[in-house]
């Protein structure tokens, strides 16, 4: 039985990530099995026919939680009174593309979306940004939507966390459930910081199971950092199904939190407990509180290796921010 209904917008509705994500959303993976969904699916003008096909498939899926499905090429209609938005629509990264190319193209897209959110969405709407460069895109959207709460903007680092989680599980030869406190700091890029020093395996420090520090620093970390490029090289397209799953999990951690769960998210750095510059979107380890709000987990130590990587990632985010004219 549906106990409440949330209004949700998904952009890039005819794209590969959205195609996978929409069915997970409709199934209840994000908001729960008792939460109805008033779903608005947006894509750019010219995609009307493809949007109608997406709607047909959702109708044919006979999802009990879908209270309404609207497809639209109007951002105003998509964002009107929403509780949550998943900003998936963007130019995907292809072989040989540089981050600066993506920043120019996708920055314009999210600026327009931010302005539309500012005029139509609920003030406390939660905004999840996916398109790359995701930290800076999220920052652009946030700054074009000053009416909305800055703390509710999230850049997706969950795919990086999942990649690291899987690699540690394989290396330790333990189930995924045995690995916890997997943390990714900083920018979602090749300069992200997969912080293995916080991880636990069977609730014990990781070094007790994976004693090979050289593997952690020089194999695992670069592998996580470059995994997106490896996927593009292998399949000729950027990650889609795994990105959709990561997005659903990222939102689930907020809407259906598990007690004690840590999750990585790119959030506003204002008043952060690590003394990092404010007015950035920076990847932090987070956890949910009983109040329904998240907090950046304070007091985690950085060893020399992690501290050095953190500075590199911070510098990249600052450089990207400096290249943007709001």
Swiss-Prot record:
One of its GO terms (biological process) is tricarboxylic acid cycle. Its EC number is 1.1.1.37. The keyword NAD applies. It catalyses: (S)-malate + NAD(+) = oxaloacetate + NADH + H(+). NAD(+) binds at residues 12-18, 106, 113, 130-132. Gene3D superfamilies: Lactate dehydrogenase/glycoside hydrolase, family 4, C-terminal, NAD(P)-binding Rossmann-like Domain. GO terms for molecular function: L-malate dehydrogenase (NAD+) activity. Substrate binds at residues 93, 99, 132, 163. Keywords: NAD, Oxidoreductase, Tricarboxylic acid cycle. InterPro entries: L-lactate/malate_DH, Lactate/malate_DH_C, Lactate/malate_DH_N, Lactate_DH/Glyco_Ohase_4_C, Malate_DH_type2, NAD(P)-bd_dom_sf. The active site is at 188 (proton acceptor). Catalyzes the reversible oxidation of malate to oxaloacetate. Belongs to the LDH/MDH superfamily. MDH type 2 family. NCBIfam families: MalateDH-SF1, PRK05442.1. This is Malate dehydrogenase. The lineage of its organism: Bacteria, Pseudomonadati, Chlamydiota, Chlamydiia, Chlamydiales. The gene is mdh.
């Amino acid at each position: 039985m549906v106990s409440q209904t949330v209004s949700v917008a998904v952009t890039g509705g005819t794209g590969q990530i959205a195609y996978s994500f929409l069915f997970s959303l409709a199934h209840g993976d994000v908001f729960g099995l008792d939460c109805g969904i008033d779903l608005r699916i947006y894509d750019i003008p010219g995609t009307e026919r493809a949007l109608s096909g997406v709607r047909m498939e959702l109708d044919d899926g006979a999802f009990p939680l879908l209270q309404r499905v609207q497809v639209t090429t109007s951002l105003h209609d998509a964002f009107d009174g929403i509780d949550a938005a998943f900003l998936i629509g963007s130019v995907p990264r292809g072989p040989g593309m540089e981050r600066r190319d993506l920043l120019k193209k996708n920055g314009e897209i999210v600026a327009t979306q931010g302005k539309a959110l500012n005029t139509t969405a609920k003030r406390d709407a939660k905004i999840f940004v996916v398109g790359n460069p995701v930290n800076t895109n999220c920052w652009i959207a946030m700054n074009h939507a000053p009416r909305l709460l800055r703390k509710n903007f999230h850049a997706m680092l969950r795919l990086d966390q999942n990649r690291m989680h899987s690699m540690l599980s394989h290396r330790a030869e333990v189930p995924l459930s045995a690995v916890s406190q997997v943390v990714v700091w900083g920018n979602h890029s090749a300069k992200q910081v997969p912080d293995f020093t916080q991880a636990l395996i069977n609730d014990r420090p990781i070094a007790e199971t994976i004693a090979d520090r050289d593997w952690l620093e020089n194999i695992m970390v670069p592998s996580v950092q470059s995994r997106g490029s490896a996927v593009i090289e292998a399949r000729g397209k950027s990650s889609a199904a795994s990105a959709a799953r990561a997005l659903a999990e990222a939102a689930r951690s907020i809407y259906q939190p598990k007690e004690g769960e840590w999750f990585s998210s790119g959030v506003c750095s204002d008043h952060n407990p690590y003394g990092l510059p404010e007015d950035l979107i920076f990847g932090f380890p987070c956890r949910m509180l009983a109040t329904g709000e998240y907090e950046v987990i304070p007091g985690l130590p950085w060893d020399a290796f992690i501290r050095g990587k953190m500075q590199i990632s911070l510098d990249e985010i600052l450089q990207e921010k400096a290249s943007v004219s709001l």
